[in-house]
Amino acid sequence: MHFHGIATQAVLASNITTGSGRHVSLSDVKWTLSSSALNSTVPASLPSQAHLDLLNAGVIDDPYYGLNEIDLQWIAQANWTYTSDPIPDLLEEYESTWLVFEGLDTFATVTFCGHNIASTNNQFRQYAFDVSSALKECTGGPVVRIDFASAPNTVDAIAADPKTPVWPVQLTAQLPNRWLMRKQQSDFGWDWGPAFAPCGPWKPAYVVQLEKTAPIHVLNTDLDIYRQGNINHLPPDQKQPWVVNASIDFIGRLPAEPRLLIEIKELETGDVLASQISDSVTLIGTSITGVTTLKDASPKLWWPSSLGAQNLYNVTITVFNKTEEVARITKRTGFRTIFLNQRNITATQLSQGIAPGANWHFEVNGKEFYAKGSNFIPPDTFWPRVTKQKMTRLLDAVVAGNQNMLRIWSSGAYLPDFIYDLADERGILLWSEFQFSDSMYPVDEDFLDNVAQEVVYNVRRVNHHPSLALWAGGNEIESLMLPLTREADPDNYPKYLAEYEKLYISLILPLVYENTRSISYSPSSTTEGYLSVNLSAPVPMTERYENDEPGAYYGDTDYYNYDTTVSFDYSIYPVGRFANEFGFHSMPSLQTWQQVADPEDLYFNSTTVVIHNRHYTSEGYGRIENSSRGMAEMTLGVERYYPIPDNPDSVANFSAWCLATQLFQADFYKSQIQFYRRGSGMPERQLGSLYWQLEDIWQGPTWAGIEYDGRWKVLHYVARDVYQPIIVSPFWNYTTGDLEIYVTADLWESAAGTVNLKWLNLSGEQIIDNAGTPTEIPFTVGAINTTKVYSTNIHDLNLPDTRASILTLSLSSQANLPNAAVKTSLTHENHFTPSFPKDLELVNPGLELSYDAHSGIFTVEAKSGVSLYTWLDYPAGLVGYFTENAFLLVPGQKKKVQFVVQDGPKDQDWEWQSEVTVRSLWDQKSSTFLYALRVATGRP
């Protein structure tokens, strides 16, 4: 985005490593943090960052609270030193001693035993330093000291160097010059998050001592599983046997004549699929590689969520020689092929009505599928406090939301293995990216060498995960930065284009191909695709760049439009092969605001609220003029389409406004998702919808569907609904009055069923003669396809009053889910009003809510009118979601809903169920909700 429970025998970690020697975790050693800006020393941790240690020491308050980001900017401007206590029991008689850092953020100087060991400048690399000689010269206990320089000050100094290149256009959020560092780019601010620019030893570190006999320690492993003969940009031959290529990166010395044993066991049963000594072993530098072909084995395939089972295997790689085992490592993996098809449309496809151009969709195990999902951003500014528990809740919500793919946006950070592990278990495909975003970047030799080390390490580290779906070069470089650069400096554009190709195509592409044959590569997140690939050429991929061919479609789309006058005009949505970004921002809930705002700041345009809104960004801290524009966009979206909250209680009114912005956001996304999914049966053959964005980095107005603490916004519930396997959708041209009803399915077989249509007035009474509309329509929809089941014009219907009418749509079908042997009953409900919600003559629905403690079921009933956007809300103090929410309810209908508790409550005696509330669109202007709000939020 740019600025404007598994089986008990499962291996839960990605790998288990054994080798010779000693391994001392530096997390078990005491640390201190100091700085001249602090004038004192505080206890510290590893892994950690300076902000977190200052918070734990009571030096600072919650960085996210109120205006603390402004007050705490001094931390980013200071240099910080982490110092360990003496490390016990390190012995000089070992063959060698190494300091290994899984991650240092970012500009660091490492000292050991008083000796300057190295300086680092890349947050995303693993570093291993031989400190053997320093240990032998140590006069006291071995101490590690890490000096971190201020990242903002460091890059500003680099920028001030006359030799540093300057580009005609660069996109800056709060802090400038982020493109000059290999550090999480959003640490300098983005339009959904703060600019804390943290520093520290953000990942684990340890000391390794290696013995004189067979001294080796495994640093990284590349496990590549693919079909024989596979090439990254070509479709795998599913008839070919599986190839397992295992490569180990190590420190130390291998003994003579090393060999590799590869053993594969099914995770659930422990059955051995294969156990083979590699036919050949290659030793290059400090990497040993072996390969084996499974000619007689047929592993169970791994499938994404809703497409089949997530079958997993443990692969154990053992390095040995004639006399002993040297090292053993176990990786959990799965057998699948994943391929990004960017090939030209074939004659067969043309004969099927698919428009000319090129494909842009994913295929898993040889089957094309519809990708449904969202974009993942860093879940916290401070990665060391991102826990497995939090990510488990988040990825469970992804699956519950009917999503099968997440795009891991750059530039945050490369995900830790445990998040890939969770995705492997749940069948969530992870489109992954290298950490470049919305900027041009240097291409000097030092920068490229630094990037090369980063790329190789991370590609190899995560390659064994079956959830890995793609490597993309960066975010919006081709689709945004190249056009902006050409517009700003057309005379020098060829130079900048060559720089783009040098980094993303000539450098990164070959590195990806050299380290994996199972994953496709795209130089940019949004692209028109390629014309040709020649791996022996200096620029091995020839990009298509901008396509001007009428009637042809190339590449994926990225769409943002903040002109709310056209938000629901689907004729202006982009028509393409795949939608990888689209969205609009909204406010989080009142409960979330209460985490970071004082009670007197709980109103729409308070300083705290506006400061926490980063759309649009302003360079520097505390500037709100651009932020106010983003607040105004949300306001206009509500005022144009929804009842305007007007509650005399200021906090109740604030809560209603927060919800109103979420209603607009959810409806806008719903409109687009339905449009893109319908495209699967249109000439564009559109096969992907990934909205912006899944979750929040902090508490503030953003594009997220899930708030910082895990609370679902309206968006996530609505997206879950329209991401169901088969849906019925209305498409209304509000200018002409034309109304079309479509059924869309992403199943792999055709499905048949019926759609029931019923016109009601807002009191819930059926309109005479169903307003001239049939009550039941049969349908058949093809595999991953759409079909129009009905069309009319609103002006031709017998509606007494378009402001008091609603069309309910109910679909039922019996169909085969992918890889399922028996048919499943599938249903979907939708509705349509021939007037926007603000113009409707709403009737008090008379909502009643009850709870059965025995069954754990909430029952909602509308007694006197149609309830639009029926919204169940739960109190602060726990995290979870309702099995249904934001639904339509008509009189006589009882909706039974359960609440899935993901975390809490801490007080086991708290009967939180009594504090669950329900409201609807009717309540947005009403004061009747005030009492329930007070109960839910603990207000007097």
Swiss-Prot record:
Keywords from the named record: Carbohydrate metabolism, Glycoprotein, Glycosidase, Hydrolase, Polysaccharide degradation, Secreted, Signal
One Pfam match: Mannosidase_ig
EC number in record: 3.2.1.25
Matches recorded under InterPro entries: Beta-gal/glucu_dom_sf, Beta-mannosidase-like_N2, Beta-mannosidase_GH2, Beta-mannosidase_Ig, Galactose-bd-like_sf, Glyco_hydro_2_Ig-like, Glycoside_hydrolase_SF, Ig-like_fold
UniProt-annotated glycosylation sites, renumbered to this chain: N15, N39, N79, N245, N314, N321, N344, N534, N605, N626, N653, N733, N761, N785
BP-aspect Gene Ontology terms: glycoprotein catabolic process; polysaccharide catabolic process
Molecular-function GO terms, alphabetical: beta-mannosidase activity
Entry's Gene Ontology cellular component terms: extracellular region
Signal sequence extent: 1-21
Principal subcellular localisation of the protein: secreted
Cellular localisation: Secreted
Catalytic activity as recorded in UniProt: Hydrolysis of terminal, non-reducing beta-D-mannose residues in beta-D-mannosides
Location of the active site: E476 (proton donor)
Origin superkingdom: Eukaryota
Pathway this chain belongs to: Glycan metabolism; N-glycan degradation
Stored PANTHER family: BETA-MANNOSIDASE, BETA-MANNOSIDASE A
Subunit structure: Homodimer.
General function of this protein: Exoglycosidase that cleaves the single beta-linked mannose residue from the non-reducing end of beta-mannosidic oligosaccharides of various complexity and length. Involved in the degradation of polymeric mannan and galactomannan.
Protein name stated in the entry: Beta-mannosidase A
The organism's taxonomic lineage, starting at the top: Eukaryota, Fungi, Dikarya, Ascomycota, Pezizomycotina
